[in-house]
Amino acid sequence: MSNIKLIVGLANPGAEYAQTRHNAGAWYVQELARICNVPLVAESKYFGVTARATLHGRDVRLLIPTTYMNLSGKSVAALANFFRILPEEILVAHDELDMDPGVAKFKLGGGHGGHNGLKDIIASLGNDKNFHRLRIGIGHPGDKNKVSGYVLGRAPAVEQERINAAIDEAVRSTEILFNQDMAKAMHRLHSFKAE
C-alpha cells in the first residue's frame, strides 16, 4: 500500500503555457482529478490549485502550483507543511527530457537533473530529495541550447498522443500504487511504451 498523501503536477501558469511540454505533470494531475471527479480549486495560501481526492479509500491531496516552474517549491512546501506531509509521502509529476514521448516512470529520490521545478522543491523541503517522482517523457531537442524553447513549446500531434497515452497509463498505474504497492505499479508502468 502506498503512503502517498500529496500528488503534485508541475507546470507554468496561464493559458499560454497550458499546452506546452513543461506542463506534462499538470496534465497528469488534471486527469487524476477528472477520474476522481473532484474540481481543482485555487487556494492562495498554497499558491496553486488543489483538490482533496479519494484513491482506493484513502485521502490524497492533488496540487498544481500556480507559481512559475522555478518557484514550485513555495507551493509544495506551503501545502506539505500545513498538512504535515513528509517528503516521502509526496509524489511529484514532471516532464522528463531524458525519456521519449510515450514513456513514464516512477522514481524515488535522486537529483533534479536540471529541472528547475524539482530544484526548487528540493530546496524548499530542506534539501530533502527523498520524495517520489513520476517522470513523463517529452524527448530532447538534441541540443542543450534549444531546451528552453523546446519545453516551452507544444509537441507535434503524434508526440502529444504518445505523451497522453503515457499519462493515461500512469493514472492506471497510480491506482495500482494505491491499491497494491509501488513495485507492482512500477512493473506495469515501466513496461509501457506508446507507439
UniProtKB/Swiss-Prot annotation:
Family annotation (SUPFAM superfamilies): Peptidyl-tRNA hydrolase-like
Family named by the database record: Belongs to the PTH family.
Catalytic activity: an N-acyl-L-alpha-aminoacyl-tRNA + H2O = an N-acyl-L-amino acid + a tRNA + H(+)
Signal peptide stretch: none
GO MF annotation, one: peptidyl-tRNA hydrolase activity
Quaternary structure (record): Monomer.
GO biological process, one term: protein quality control for misfolded or incompletely synthesized proteins
Entry's EC annotation: 3.1.1.29
Known function: Hydrolyzes ribosome-free peptidyl-tRNAs (with 1 or more amino acids incorporated), which drop off the ribosome during protein synthesis, or as a result of ribosome stalling. Catalyzes the release of premature peptidyl moieties from peptidyl-tRNA molecules trapped in stalled 50S ribosomal subunits, and thus maintains levels of free tRNAs and 50S ribosomes.
Record protein name field: Peptidyl-tRNA hydrolase
Site (Discriminates between blocked and unblocked aminoacyl-tRNA): N12
Keywords: Cytoplasm, Hydrolase, RNA-binding, tRNA-binding
Organism expressing this protein natively: Shewanella frigidimarina (strain NCIMB 400)
Residues flagged as site, Stabilizes the basic form of H active site to accept a proton: D95
Annotated localization: Cytoplasm
Active site: H22
One GO term describing the cellular component: cytoplasm
InterPro entries xrefs: Pept_tRNA_hydro (IPR001328), Pept_tRNA_hydro_CS (IPR018171), Pept_tRNA_hydro_sf (IPR036416)
Binding of tRNA, residues: Y17, Y68, N70, N116
